[in-house]
Amino acid sequence: MAKSSSSSSPSPAAASAATTSSAPPLPASYEAALQELEGLVAGLESGQLPLDQLLTGYQRGAQLLKFCRDKLEAVETQIKVLEGTELKPWVQE
């Protein structure tokens, strides 16, 4: 009987997985991610958020930053393919 009562409580790993699965999905575009990230930074810098929201905002910001960096890296790779293996510097006309 003791075995069944201990199996009813979720393990820390299961609780962690449940927390991460409830995270909002990543934005559909770089621009949407950047806009959300800018809003988060403004909220964090305001100093008006409670501590738990600061942590949540920081974690979401880290996700968005990784998303934006990955998108930029993918575009850079595509540009390299279009221009050969060497990325040429952009010159504004």
From Swiss-Prot:
GO molecular function: exodeoxyribonuclease VII activity
Region Disordered, residue ranges: 1-26
Principal cellular location given in the protein's record: cytoplasm
Catalytic activity: Exonucleolytic cleavage in either 5'- to 3'- or 3'- to 5'-direction to yield nucleoside 5'-phosphates
Pfam families: Exonuc_VII_S
GO biological-process terms attached to the record: DNA catabolic process
Gene Ontology CC: cytosol; exodeoxyribonuclease VII complex
Keywords: Cytoplasm, Exonuclease, Hydrolase, Nuclease
UniProt enzyme class: hydrolase
Biased segments, Low complexity type: 1-23
Cell compartment(s), UniProt: Cytoplasm
EC number: 3.1.11.6
Entries under InterPro entries matching the protein: Exonuc_VII_S, Exonuc_VII_ssu_sf
Transmembrane stretches, start-end: none
NCBIfam families named in the record: PRK00977.1-5, xseB
Oligomer status and interactors: Heterooligomer composed of large and small subunits.
PANTHER family linked to this entry: EXODEOXYRIBONUCLEASE 7 SMALL SUBUNIT
Known function: Bidirectionally degrades single-stranded DNA into large acid-insoluble oligonucleotides, which are then degraded further into small acid-soluble oligonucleotides.
UniProt record similarity statement: Belongs to the XseB family.
The protein's name in its UniProt record: Exodeoxyribonuclease 7 small subunit
Organism: Polaromonas sp. (strain JS666 / ATCC BAA-500)
Gene name of this polypeptide: xseB
